[in-house]
Amino acid sequence: MSQTTTTSASETLGFQAEVKQLLHLMIHSLYSNKEIFLRELVSNASDACDKLRFEAIDQPGLLEGDGELAIRVGYDKAARTITISDNGIGLSRDEAVANLGTIARSGTREFFSQLTGDKQKDAQLIGQFGVGFYSSFIVADKVTVLSRRAGLAANEAIRWESDGQGEFSIAPAEKAGRGTDVVLHLRADEDELLNGWKLREILRRYSDHISLPIRMAKEDWDAEKGEQVKGDELETVNQANALWTRNKSDITDEQYREFYKTVSHDYDDPLAWTHNRVEGRSEYTQLLYVPKHAPFDLWDRDARRGVKLYVKRVFIMDDAEQLLPSYLRFVRGVIDSADLPLNVSREILQESRDVRAIREGSAKRVLSLLEDMAENKAEDYATFWTEFGQVLKEGTGEDAANRERIARLLRFASTHDGEQAQTVSFADYVGRMKDGQDKIYYVTADTFTAAANSPHLEIFRKKGIEVLLLSDRVDEWMLSYLREFDGKSLVSVAKGGLDLAELADEEEKKRQSEVAETFKPLVERLQQALAEQVKEVRVTQRLVDSPACVVVGQNELSPHLLRMLKAAGQEAPEVKPVLEINPDHALVARIRDASDAEFGDWAALLLDQALLAEGAQIADPAAFVKRLNGLLLKA
């Protein structure tokens, strides 16, 4: 937008190691979709103008008498360059070094650890990470950035330059107008981009929704030269109004998808979106998207969260996490409020009644979107659940007002089909309950395999009663808030004295009573031998194929949760389990006849194998092996 000259005091610096790695990966993984460079650079230019507009609310002098913000795209066939210019906030020297030479964001190490070498998969990850400015090097073998931050003098501009190979130079420069010019020196095989029609086509496809005017030199056909020739007049090539302010009927699905890619910097299309204008107690417009893939930093506490916040179409901040509850932190998009003050801060957002109304309304809108997807687009919902199901489970504790709605959206693995895929809803389970059954049964474990092979399931399989198999880390926390569904209690098959009386006939009840009396002496011997390790020993009806299992009280922390707490360095109470024995198992019969000299070893072996089957670590593995070998030699 303005001519620039540089002084000679240039300094050469090295890229951060992660930048070099990202540049190499990006050039090789994203080349098939190389046109995104223009989308990314125009998006950056738009952000720079938004930030200037926001800072100028308190410092109007930053506008320097030029309040018409715009983006300009030009090309020079002779020089083989494309230039993207803006008159936004600009960069100081320190900002240029920080923003153009390093990746200053959390989760960088996790991002690189997930790269596989598969171009398609890595392209998706790189897209999630956000390539931004570095996408320039997909099509350019040298990039020059000329920038002056608003408020600095003309001779305090900077010139940044790099070939993307590992180093960049930065030098003082003079620049009459504020803002940034990004000059791409194209690679030898990128001639097709030196074409006004091609650039306009890319801009209209990827950046039509940008609210600022994107201008290019008007071109007319020159019959003598046989080509389009640029004139001095500029024309706006995009619609230049905020997409979310338009009527839904005037927006195509493709425009919605491209807007998502701009606000999220995602490489892939969104899974679903909702666009609404809300009027009443609080007036705002929301355009919210559910991504198709979870970001690599979904579980990083310091990662970016939330949506873009605008007030009366003026950009206020990125990642306004207060506008959505934490369990919907994967949602991307824009919320434009008509009621919040323009000088709103993050502190005000935490206390504002209007923000609470927006958060509640937006949560309900996203849940409605998910409900519609679950009911009408089963494959899409299965994709959503695989990517974000564990996060949605957090909502059972965080959002009491919507707990029932969230519960209906949950999906689990189940003994119904024995598959690891989490496809069973509570409604599915209730619809298959046996006559007389009034509880929803579940088992928790460290892994799906451990849950599916839990000895606690044996009696349920025998009776044909379905059990939900829960192995996500969040499940135990979720269950502390979610106690029932549709009036039916959620009951762990590994807690308390299992009551299946409603499913047993009179003859079976009589037999159970007789067996308990018959095995009373053995129970007392085991109780005495294991007094230090267990709270109680009792005969069980929950086992069919296993000799014993351990359970805890109905209101005690499960062994699975205790292990999680200890692994996280948290204090965990010592809970003595109850040992339940299977009176019909041959090993129990063998122990019943054991001599006093051997009984202690048999009792300890029975407890240790029950603990191992439950997924616990036994206190003394060496003693367990020695004891087992000794008893095997005597067998």
Curated annotation (Swiss-Prot):
Keywords (A to Z) from UniProt: ATP-binding, Chaperone, Cytoplasm, Nucleotide-binding, Stress response
UniProt xrefs under CDD domains: HATPase_Hsp90-like
UniProt entry tagged with the keyword DNA damage: no
Family annotation (PROSITE patterns): HSP90
Keyword Chaperone: yes
CC per GO annotation: cytoplasm
Biological source species: Bordetella pertussis (strain Tohama I / ATCC BAA-589 / NCTC 13251)
Described function: Molecular chaperone. Has ATPase activity.
Span list, region B: 347-563
Sample GO molecular function, one term: ATP-dependent protein folding chaperone
Cited InterPro entries: HATPase_C_sf, Heat_shock_protein_90_CS, HSP90_C, Hsp90_fam, Hsp90_N, Ribosomal_Su5_D2-typ_SF
Subcellular location: Cytoplasm
Region (C): 564-635
Family matches, as Pfam families: HATPase_c_3 (PF13589), HSP90 (PF00183)
Family from the record: Belongs to the heat shock protein 90 family.
UniProt subunit comment: Homodimer.
Stretches the record annotates as A: 1-346
Protein known as: Chaperone protein HtpG
